[in-house]
Swiss-Prot record:
HAMAP family: MshC (MF_01697). Residues 1-20 are annotated as: Disordered. A motif ('ERGGDP' region) lies at residues 191-196. GO terms for molecular function: ATP binding; cysteine-glucosaminylinositol ligase activity; cysteine-tRNA ligase activity; zinc ion binding. Zn(2+) binds at residues 44, 236, 261. A motif ('HIGH' region) lies at residues 46-56. One of its GO terms (cellular component) is cytosol. This is L-cysteine:1D-myo-inositol 2-amino-2-deoxy-alpha-D-glucopyranoside ligase. Monomer. Keywords: ATP-binding, Ligase, Metal-binding, Nucleotide-binding, Zinc. Belongs to the class-I aminoacyl-tRNA synthetase family. MshC subfamily. It comes from Kineococcus radiotolerans (strain ATCC BAA-149 / DSM 14245 / SRS30216).
């Protein structure tokens, strides 16, 4: 599956410091990526049935900041992202709207590509749909079965026999990604695609690895597994192991993926590659974006779509600036005021870098680098740019190179394009 075009990332003098990031599993700041060489990043992708709302954009912009900071520190970045282009919510939406699920997925992925391109998000090197990785995922399920780390469940209520599940008790580290208690995990499992009440499971938390074919559902041949399709969590695990190896430097996604998705994915990986654990050196989770006091979600329908904002005349750089003005781990609310503030800030910054000269900007570059290296503190970086812009407005300045350095700093590190 193709991704999208690579935005221009201006060159900057010098190099940034090593990045430290909040790790969900330990609850503290940890250095991420090597001091030299290649950093690896896996970010869970969309289920394509309502393309990019601001909650999505917040996540992919957040981890784009990480990739930019890594590259600025002199690292190569291997970045993989999936698309969950066959899953129950997608199939349900397709049936409800009378659209073929494949056409729905492709149309929404195309919108997503356009949104990411507009927001100047650097694309992953490998952008993979689950449909094109079914053989890979099925192989992982067969490997788990062969290792005694998977089991089949008989059908219920007239359903077919043979669904394959993963026994969470097989991984001694299960529960360490999110640190939730059993009651919370059971509630989140039921809320987020699990089936804790299914008869025949050894543990209510055990996740589905392979769903055998049901009438009217897409299915693929998978040898001893029979015709069927993958469960959600094993998809990302199999793709990440194939294209990044283990351990990954950072496994990332929205905070609603901590459990069950990332917890289960790590457990799968630990059983598939027991000598290479942990699955990831750090787990990073972005905050949720709300509208009218409620988290944006497809199920609630309270979505602000990036494509609609841009179609309404809002520059994509303004949308990105609104996002990076909020710390990547915080929950925040999209409002007209947030948009107005971002628009006004973008205008001030654009005017300042259009001037023939300004105050020296080397210290600003250093500050932006320091802020991003400290848990991707983009709001701190934005505040530093604001301070330089205000100084430029009140004192003018005589450094003819400064405006261009500020423009390149903002573009390269924050991903905000200034005209």
């Amino acid at each position: 599956m193709r991704s999208w075009s690579v935005p221009e990332v201006p060159a900057l003098p010098g190099r940034g410091p090593r990045v430290h990031l909040h790790d969900t599993a330990t609850g503290g700041l940890v250095p991420v990526g090597p001091e030299a060489g290649t950093a690896t990043l896996y970010v869970c992708g969309i289920t394509p049935y309502d393309a990019t709302h601001l909650g999505h954009a917040n996540t992919y912009v957040a981890f784009d900041l990480l990739g930019r900071a890594w590259r600025d520190a002199g690292l190569d970045v291997r970045y993989v992202q999936n698309v969950t282009d066959v899953d129950d919510p997608l199939l349900e939406r397709a049936e409800a709207t009378g659209v073929d699920w494949r056409d729905l997925a492709e149309s929404q992925v195309e919108l997503f590509r356009g949104d990411m391109e507009a927001l100047s998000v650097v694309p992953p090197q490998r952008y993979l749909g689950v449909v094109e990785a079914v053989d890979l995922v099925a192989e992982a399920v067969r490997d788990l079965l062969a290792a005694g780390a998977a089991y089949r469940v008989p059908g219920t209520d007239g359903g077919p026999d043979g669904d394959v599940y993963f026994p969470v008790d097989a991984d001694a580290a299960f529960g360490t990604v999110g640190g939730y208690d059993l009651e919370t995990m059971l509630a989140l499992s039921a809320e987020r695609g699990g089936d804790p009440q299914r008869p025949g499971k050894r543990n209510p938390l055990d996740p589905l690895l392979w769903r055998v074919e049901r009438p009217g559902e897409p299915a693929w041949e998978a040898g001893e597994l029979g015709r069927g399709r993958p469960g959600w969590h094993i998809e990302c695990t199999a793709i990440a192991l194939e294209h990044l190896g283990m351990p990954i430097d950072v496994q990332a996604g929205g905070s609603d993926l901590v459990f069950p998705h990332h917890e289960m994915g790590a457990a799968h990986a630990h059983l598939l590659r027991p000598r290479a654990r942990p699955f990831a050196r750090a787990y990073a989770h972005s905050g949720m974006v709300a509208l009218d006091g409620e988290k944006m979600s497809k199920s609630k329908g309270n979505l602000v779509l990036v494509s609609r904002l841009v179609a309404a005349g809002v520059p994509a750089a303004v949308v990105r600036l609104a996002i990076v003005d909020h710390h990547w781990r915080t929950d925040w609310e999209w409002t007209d005021e947030v948009l107005a503030q971002a628009r006004a800030r973008h205008e001030r910054w654009s005017a300042a870098v259009a001037a023939p000269a300004g105050p020296p900007a080397e210290a600003l570059l250093a500050t932006v680098r320091e802020r991003l290296a400290d848990d991707l503190d983009a709001p701190g970086a934005v505040a530093a740019v604001d301070a330089w812009v205000e100084q430029a407005r009140t004192t003018a300045g005589t450094d003819a190179q400064a405006p261009d350095l500020v423009r390149r700093t903002v573009s390269a590190l924050l991903g905000v394009v200034l005209p």
